[in-house]
């Protein structure tokens, strides 16, 4: 193995801790440090957003489904987003749906479970690479046009929005992130980008980066090998993608 590039959120903590041993074996990687990885965790996202000057819906970690019995009296009205600390996000319109989501997420991802205020608006995602010093390289942006039942992008179109780019740059600078990154935001009715999630890897739609003239996996490989990354063209907005699955 020359280079090891993780693709799943749950792989990151293990591989970050193993990075020195991997380097000793001659296996290259391009990974954040433990502090950077922890700083973008879903249960610390609100703190990061405040530090970077980015809006974000309030998020609360919980360990008991009993929270949903009287959450509306605690100023947490439905609908709410119920999320796993590593993965999974489900919209709950009432107590019953919230408790079902809570139990399913605990069974797969463990505790805590996160409850997030639901923001409505236009969903956009940005993928790029942090260089470890605070710079964001090769950003590619897309707007969701169709989603799965879990809210994952099934179809989308490439965009270029300077305000979204600046928002992502502030977040990457605050983290001093190193490696691939996906930033999920919601553009609310006031035109403000609300930070929803930061994922520590490329998204499933990353092939769109090749389609818009910015091959981010190739850039990541070059950086991991210590080579100069390829020159990037300005991204091409208006490129449509549709995901498909074959079993």
Language-model region placement:
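ATP-grasp fold ATP-binding core
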Residues: 49, 59, 72-91, 110-121, ...
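Phosphate-binding site of ATP-dependent enzymes
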Residues: 93-176, 186-194
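Short glycine-/acidic-enriched loop or helix-start segments at secondary-structure transitions
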Residues: 14-17, 91-92, 125-127, 207
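Short, charged, surface-exposed secondary-structure boundary motifs
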Residues: 31, 37-43, 91-94, 149-151
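Short amphipathic alpha-helix with an adjacent loop that forms part of the alpha/beta core around
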Residues: 1, 68-75
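Structured catalytic cores of enzymes that bind and process phosphorylated ligands/cofactors
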Residues: 29, 45, 57-61, 112
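A short, GP-enriched loop/loop-strand-helix hinge that lies immediately N-terminal to
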Residues: 2-40, 55-58
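ATP-dependent carboxylate activation and anion-phosphoryl transfer catalytic cores
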Residues: 160-247
């Amino acid at each position: 193995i020359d280079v090891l590039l993780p693709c799943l959120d749950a792989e990151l903590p293990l591989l970050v801790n193993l990075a020195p041993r991997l380097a000793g074996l001659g296996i290259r990687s391009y990974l954040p440090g433990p502090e950077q990885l922890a700083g973008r965790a879903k249960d610390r996202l609100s703190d990061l957003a405040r530090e970077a000057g980015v809006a974000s819906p309030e998020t609360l970690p919980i360990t008991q489904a009993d929270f949903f019995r009287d959450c509306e009296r605690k100023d947490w009205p439905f609908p709410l987003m119920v999320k796993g600390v590593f993965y999974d996000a489900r919209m709950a319109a009432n107590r019953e749906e919230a408790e079902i989501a809570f139990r399913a997420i605990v069974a797969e991802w463990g505790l805590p479970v996160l409850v997030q205020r639901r923001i409505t608006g236009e969903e956009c995602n940005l993928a790029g690479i942090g260089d470890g010093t605070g710079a964001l390289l090769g950003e590619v942006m897309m707007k969701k046009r169709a989603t799965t039942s879990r809210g994952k992008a099934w179809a989308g179109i490439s965009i270029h929005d300077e305000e979204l780019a600046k928002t992502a740059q502030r977040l990457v600078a605050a983290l001093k992130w190193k490696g691939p990154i996906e930033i999920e935001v919601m553009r609310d009715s006031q035109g403000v980008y609300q930070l929803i999630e930061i994922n520590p890897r490329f998204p499933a739609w990353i092939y769109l980066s090749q389609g818009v003239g910015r091959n981010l996996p190739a850039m990541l490989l070059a950086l991991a090998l210590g080579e100069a990354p390829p020159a990037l063209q300005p991204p091409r907005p208006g490129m449509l993608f549709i995901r498909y699955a074959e079993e």
